[in-house]
Amino acid sequence: VSIFAEIHTANAEDEPAFVRAVEGIAELKLANGMQVLLFPDVSKPTVTVNLTFFVGSRHEGYGEAGMAHLLEHMLFKGTTARPAIPAELTKRGAQFNGTTWLDRTNYYETLSASDENLEFAISMEADRMINSLIKGEDLASEMTVVRNEFERGENSPQRVLMQRIFST
């Protein structure tokens, strides 16, 4: 908790508020309403930062199919401070990805456990959630990627079944 507080607090009212702890998992709430679940596990040689936003494809309106998934892809395109997020994560040896589902979108990275890597991951996530660069040429190329992923899913009987089940 201390490294999180050190990274993201400019003054006392910005400090995460403790909500509760259940079976070693501490829940904190930031001033902006973001929920933080902190689960230290000193037996693991890695640190994982996973952000989940409760917005997904079911929140898309008519004519917006695929927009949540497209935005997920676009947030890997970089920021002014970090123009090559995937390259930076790869250089640090991270495993990373993002996923979109009906009711959520998440982004995660797993790195070697260190205060430096934890600080990097939290800082990088905060930066890309606010300062992502969304360029027309990137939108065009990622629309093709997302469309191809969607079409592959249309040919999967399991995916079609799941979509029909969850659409009710």
Question: Which residues does each predicted region cover?
Answer:
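Scaffold signal of the M16-like zinc-metallopeptidase fold and its non-catalytic homologs
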Residues: F4-I7, N11, M74, T79, ...
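Histidine-acidic residue clusters that define the catalytic metal-binding segment
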Residues: N11-E27, Y107, S167-T168
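Mature N-terminal segment immediately following signal peptide/propeptide cleavage
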Residues: F18-T52
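Solvent-exposed coil/turn segments that connect beta secondary-structure elements
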Residues: A31, D41-S43, T52-G56, T79-T80, ...
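M16/MPP (pitrilysin/insulinase) zinc-metallopeptidase core fold and M16-derived inactive scaffolds
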Residues: T48-S112, N155
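M16/insulysin-pitrilysin zinc metalloprotease superfamily fold
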Residues: G78-T79, T110-M143
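Acidic/histidine-enriched alpha-helical segments
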Residues: A87-T90, L133-E151
